[in-house]
Amino acid sequence: MNAPVKPSQLIKGATGDWEVVIGLEIHAQVSSNAKLFSGAATAFGGDPNSHVSLVDAAMPGMLPVINEECVKQAIRSGLGLNAQINLRSVFDRKNYFYPDLPQGYQISQYKSPIVGEGIVVVDLPNGDSITVGIERLHLEQDAGKLLHDQHPTMTFVDLNRSGVALMEIVSKPDLRSSEQAKAYVSKLRTILRYLGTCDGDMEKGSLRADVNVSVRKPGEPYGTRCEIKNVNSIRFIGQAIEYEARRQIGILEDGGSIDQETRLYDPDKAETRSMRSKEEAHDYRYFPDPDLLPLEFSQAYVDELKTGLPELPDQKKSRFIGTFGLSSDDAGVLVSERESADFYEAVLAKLSDAARDGKLAANWVINELFGRLNKDGQNIDTSPVSAAQLAAIVDLIGEGTISGKIAKELFEIVWREGGDPRELVEARGMKQVTDLTAIEKVVDDIVASNPDKVAQAIAKPAMLGWFVGQVMKSSGGKANPQAVNDLLKRKLGL
């Protein structure tokens, strides 16, 4: 869906340039209290087999019953991906044997998924943006988990995860680099978090990626792809793509051919290794599940869910840029996590003049607050400086009560000790000096003491900054910088 691949995205090989082609299948755990076809809990971290119903364990005679909340979450996700919502979809049985799959098949959707084609616009680190096509989103059951470390000669099965609802979100092969793939997964996770349809916690397995990689000479047909299963971090996704592309190029340049196979990524060795030959659809013998009726709902049902959607990242970013004059980069940083955007919105709500100081507030949230949080290894939820306190600091700057330099000192005090910023400014004598007479005396003293610098400044006006620095230093940072600038220009005839 995007422009031809850029030369910088091509991989240099012994026989020339190669293009990597990437498609992703994201498995996102649906945020719901119960599983897709049973009432068993979905909470993470329970004792093994403590969240298992008779349906999840595939006991004879137990029939699946659809969880409507999971259906709603899938529709909300589809709407957030600008996708076609299919008013009729079908659940199919995907037949394969594995010890953590008690039914002997997985209930999934094959030919008739709940969500059809959509798009995601992805901002890249270099400032470019790409549009990634969504092929489909379908609902399916998760499998259980095999425990290999509990006994020296036996493997145990934990079915807590069995039957948990997953959304499989399949992209088109529109990605052309590991950086694009990482940015896409990050954007997709952000959208799902905003929607509240998946918490996106990759450490807990709530979001996992199957990465499809192939290589080709530019302009040639797609090559044979390999699928790297269950990659559970954005960083590992990038590393897996880089390694796999190089591996395939090496084989092809040596005169070999690529086997279509499923591979695993080993983060300790930073390499992929073969797992099994890649199955085709016919290997799974899909057929409609006879225990489940087709899923049908009206357009009115979809429209009602659409009216309840929150403001999504792209919409919020556009509003921040249009209303408060933020740069695209700053707005992008703020909306990249819902918690960050919510904090900024809370600061705006407390400002006395958001129209005047909205941009200043963004600078303080991004540079001062985020910088200090990163330094101390904290996140926005545990910030010692509240939105109300940060808004008060921005207000004090905006109204001219304190300078930016004093504001940074005030921020440190609030971070360490807490307290009301206005009261701290009063109690500690931190107010900015705006009395022109007092400032003028300091300016006159410095000008009189530095005739050589005066001559340099007259010849080279950029030297004015030296005088400003001296005045601010002499006043303890309390002099109004604009007043200092104006006085110096007048005194020096600039």
Swiss-Prot record:
It is an enzyme of class 6 (ligase). It catalyses: L-glutamyl-tRNA(Gln) + L-glutamine + ATP + H2O = L-glutaminyl-tRNA(Gln) + L-glutamate + ADP + phosphate + H(+); L-aspartyl-tRNA(Asn) + L-glutamine + ATP + H2O = L-asparaginyl-tRNA(Asn) + L-glutamate + ADP + phosphate + 2 H(+). One of its GO terms (biological process) is translation. Keywords: ATP-binding, Ligase, Nucleotide-binding, Protein biosynthesis. Its EC number is 6.3.5.-. Gene3D superfamilies: 1.10.10.410, GatB domain, N-terminal subdomain. The keyword Ligase applies. It comes from the Bacteria. GO terms for molecular function: asparaginyl-tRNA synthase (glutamine-hydrolyzing) activity; ATP binding; glutaminyl-tRNA synthase (glutamine-hydrolyzing) activity. Allows the formation of correctly charged Asn-tRNA(Asn) or Gln-tRNA(Gln) through the transamidation of misacylated Asp-tRNA(Asn) or Glu-tRNA(Gln) in organisms which lack either or both of asparaginyl-tRNA or glutaminyl-tRNA synthetases. The reaction takes place in the presence of glutamine and ATP through an activated phospho-Asp-tRNA(Asn) or phospho-Glu-tRNA(Gln). Heterotrimer of A, B and C subunits. Belongs to the GatB/GatE family. GatB subfamily. This is Aspartyl/glutamyl-tRNA(Asn/Gln) amidotransferase subunit B. It comes from Rhodopseudomonas palustris (strain BisB5). The lineage of its organism: Bacteria, Pseudomonadati, Pseudomonadota, Alphaproteobacteria, Hyphomicrobiales.
